[in-house]
A protein has these predicted regions:
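A short glycine-rich, Lys/Arg-flanked "PGG" loop and its adjoining helix->strand segment in the class I
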Residues: 175-187
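A short SAM/SAH-binding and catalytic strip from SAM-dependent methyltransferases
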Residues: 135-136, 145-175
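Short, glycine-/aromatic-enriched active-site segment of Class I SAM-dependent methyltransferases
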Residues: 198-214
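Conserved beta-strand signature within the Rossmann-like core of class I S-adenosyl-L-methionine
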Residues: 157-161, 184-195
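Rossmann-like AdoMet
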Residues: 1-133, 137-150, 258
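Short "lid" loop at the C-terminus of a central beta-strand within the Rossmann-like core
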Residues: 164-167, 196-200
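Core SAM-dependent methyltransferase catalytic element
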Residues: 238, 243-268
Length: 268
């Protein structure tokens, strides 16, 4: 099957759970299949806080993008692992502050691609684009036509890696991937990263979530998450439990969310 622009549309494998569709299920969306729901329910049975975690991750996105656009003057965003469109997507938050903001979304689920083309529409002053790619191949993202046509890599870019790097296992070089992406961006660019952790989980829960059938490739501790920001200048409050990052209200307990988050700037 071909899309309107002539690209061949990849096939959706509904028998295998996909993180973007499972995330949609936890958020109460309808763009998911039986395999996604089965996997999502299995994880929720062991870790009931998962729905709180995904809601808090979306709230973090809003806070971080607002901070970067309003306080750091960022006008370009590269959002990798964007997931299915929902309320307060990156471009919507950024363009409320700066209508001229430009955003490139990246994901590797064909269903996300279909919805992104239809729903992730920019303001008249700005621009959005979508890249069908995997974070594990950063050069494919950086050298894509969409990035070249949408972003000026001579000007600061916010790299958004929300709830994605825990799907990259140690043998897939997660730190090298992030370093490759960050070093391709100019000084003044920022990294926004959230990451699941087992720091507050019983060992059996962590083992199930990290299993090949259901989960994250690697839950990492705080020091391991902080390592993604090596060489960057952390913005206050640093690497903290996700819901506590510049929280606007009393956050849920760290153990209920079981994620860390941080925002950092590439120095001049």
């Amino acid at each position: 099957m071909q899309s309107e622009d002539g690209d061949v549309a990849p096939t959706i494998d509904v028998s295998v759970p996909h993180p973007a569709r499972r995330y949609d299920y936890w958020l109460g969306g309808k763009d998911n299949f039986a395999a996604d729901r089965e996997s999502g329910d299995a994880i929720a049975a062991q870790f009931p806080g998962i729905r709180t975690a995904v809601v808090e991750n979306r709230r973090l996105l809003r806070r971080a993008v607002t901070q970067l656009a309003a306080e750091q003057g960022i006008r370009q965003f590269l959002d990798i692992g964007t997931g299915l469109p929902t309320a307060s997507n990156t471009h919507e938050v950024a363009q409320l502050i700066a209508p001229e903001a430009r955003i490139v979304y990246v994901d590797n689920d064909p269903l996300v691609l279909t919805h992104a083309r239809a729903l992730l529409t920019s303001s008249a002053e700005g621009r959005t684009a979508y890249v069908d790619a995997d974070v594990r191949d950063p050069d494919n993202i950086l050298h894509s036509r969409e990035v070249a046509d949408t972003l000026d890599l001579n000007q600061p870019v916010a790299l958004m890696l929300l709830a994605v790097m825990h799907f990259v296992t140690d043998d897939e070089d997660p730190y090298g991937i992030v370093k490759r992406l960050v070093t391709a961006l100019p000084p003044g660019s920022c990294l926004v990263l959230s990451h699941a952790t087992a720091d507050w989980m019983p060992p059996e829960t962590a083992a199930m979530i990290q299993s090949g059938k259901h989960g994250a490739g690697r839950l990492r501790g705080r020091d391991e998450v902080a390592r993604f920001f090596d060489g960057l200048e952390l913005i206050e409050p640093g690497v903290v439990p996700l819901a506590e990052w510049r929280s606007e209200a009393t956050p849920p307990p760290a153990a209920e969310v079981a994620m860390y988050a941080g925002v950092a700037r590439r120095p001049s």
